[in-house]
């Protein structure tokens, strides 16, 4: 029957998505370690971007996707010291479409995470004609410290604990969000990252083997 066929297709889709999730999780540590191969310290900024409630009725997946792609391009053009980013698109009844983004900057160039987070958020508001909203997660760093999960702000190459916290936090972004499946056509991405040129490890800096996400 058609119903059983649809159910089978849904189960296969979930299976495929879980496989992609596992692959993405494994790649996170490799991605972060490759950045530390080239930089002694990284400034990590977490930003949540979305839309104001008055704009919810106008939102479509294509509009949200185009806005996100345009925003990430603008940030790359505006900040040459941006060395990486990872994003995850989510959907909720209360917040509708929203995206969690972790921006990673060369820590030798940028040091002020809170003010930079505000600047990144203001770029989003500006390009969305003030229909967009954002939350700068840097203001919650004290809470993260108390919970033992602080992996944002300045992260030094030698700070094993903070690097593991960073990888764990980024691994969360790869988790399968079942709510968005209802509004997301098969084949559309909910997770992505800034592609980097071929790895060129910094001279004199040994590769790390201890920062893993499993």
Task: Set out the residue ranges of the language-model regions.
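Histidine-centered divalent-metal-coordination microenvironment in nucleic-acid enzymes
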Residues: 85-108
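Signature for HUH/AEP ssDNA processing cores
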Residues: 30-91
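SsDNA-processing nucleotidyl-transfer enzymes
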Residues: 8-41
